[in-house]
Design a protein with these regions (language model features):
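Conserved small helical "lid"/interfacial subdomain of P-loop NTPases
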Residues: 1-5
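Accessory nucleic acid-recognition modules appended to NTPase machines
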Residues: 38-184
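Amphipathic alpha-helical "lid/sensor" segments that cap RecA-like P-loop NTPase cores
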Residues: 6-58
């Protein structure tokens, strides 16, 4: 249906558009982790899905501690929602890690990237030429690899990302500026 409408260059119509946007927001909330998707399909319960995603995030934290006993990688990871919320042009490492050497920061970012839990987007001065020759290793943004985990990480300070928050996000009724959720 979507292909036919797209190929014919006709609008979806309000009803189909609303459903597609709701499905997209549902994907942003649940994410694509197989355990979270499976839990949502089985229970249709956001609390249980949130518990699954928190377990995954806890496993990530355990792995980060194995890589970096100082906890700096965990701090960089946990600060991703706050950094994206700032709407800055780059991740400001100095606001997360004080007195950290640039070479140490590059090493931490490389470890985080190698963990496959984040995507690093580097600033490039001239993207038309080869990206690797123009990327600025000191100017970057970090994004979580799974949008559902990002949603849970955003509300990590609460014991449970309440069903009411999920429902409001799903129905576009949450008053906060959550553009950074879409950016991730």
């Amino acid at each position: 249906l979507i292909h036919k409408l797209f190929d014919s260059q006709k609008p979806f119509g309000e009803e189909i558009n609303r459903k597609l946007m709701r499905d997209f927001r549902l994907y942003m909330l649940v994410g694509g982790m197989p355990q979270a998707v499976d839990e949502y399909i089985k229970t249709n319960n956001f609390r249980k899905v949130d518990d699954v995603k928190r377990d995954i995030l806890n496993l990530y934290e355990d792995d980060f501690k194995k890589i970096d006993a100082t906890g700096k990688i965990s701090m960089l990871f946990d600060a991703i929602p706050a950094q994206l919320n700032k709407n800055a042009s780059r991740y400001q490492v100095s606001s997360v890690l004080t007195n950290n050497r640039a070479d140490n920061t590059l090493e931490l970012i490389a470890e985080l990237k190698d963990s496959k839990t984040v995507l690093v987007s580097y600033h490039a001065n001239d993207p038309s030429a080869g990206m690797s020759t123009n990327k600025d290793l000191t100017r970057f943004k970090l994004f979580l690899c799974d949008t559902g985990l990002f949603t849970t990480l955003m509300f990590k300070d609460k014991d449970f990302t309440e069903n009411i928050i999920y429902e409001k996000l799903l129905n576009e009724q949450l008053g906060n500026n959550l553009g950074y959720l879409s950016e991730n």
